[in-house]
Amino acid sequence: NQILEVENLKAVDADGTVLFDHVNFNIEKGQKVVFLSRNPKAMTALFEIINGNRKADAGTYNWGITITTAYLPLDNTDFFNTDKNLVDWLSQYGPGNEVAMKGFLGRMLFKQEEVEKKVNVLSGGEKMRCMIARMQLQNANCLILDTPTNHLDLESIQAFNNNLVGFKGNILFSSHDHEFINTVADRIIELTPKGTIDKLMTYDDYIHDEQIKEQKAGMY
């Protein structure tokens, strides 16, 4: 049942700012966890570390042996330096014929005539929808999402939200979208330079809890 175990993790920004320290948590099966911090770089650093793209400044992490991850990074620029169309682009990332690829794109609200578009001319929102389709194609049991609601319009957020609420695996994510966090997350972990605040509650309850506000005041 072990999904991810993190022990004493620390990340320091290039300018010497401590993004987080003394971070310890265990993710349990099925949990959908939102990560918060006053410094948005903290979440990106955590996600990059647990994906093996960045070295932690201290501490360790261990994934469970049956876990497969799909990562939606904050910066997706490098994925789109090509003149492939949407269907050909998506086909690189998993098995399936053209009809299947169009199905994945359709679920992220791409119309029939849009799938012939070249990916290097897409808007920020369209790129994010492509990245979500790519992630769904990977069929992982743990999704790691760094601010996935960036650039998305309301309709796209709603479509994505509905997919995630029904998702049976684990989700580790960050977001600026209040409603999105509230409907997806069942656990909240706030990353600070002095450790974590870790609660099994809704986002609304978390931000209105007076004890948590007091605790938070001493941690930054």
Which residue ranges define each predicted feature?
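ABC ATP-binding cassette signature C-motif
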Residues: 1-220
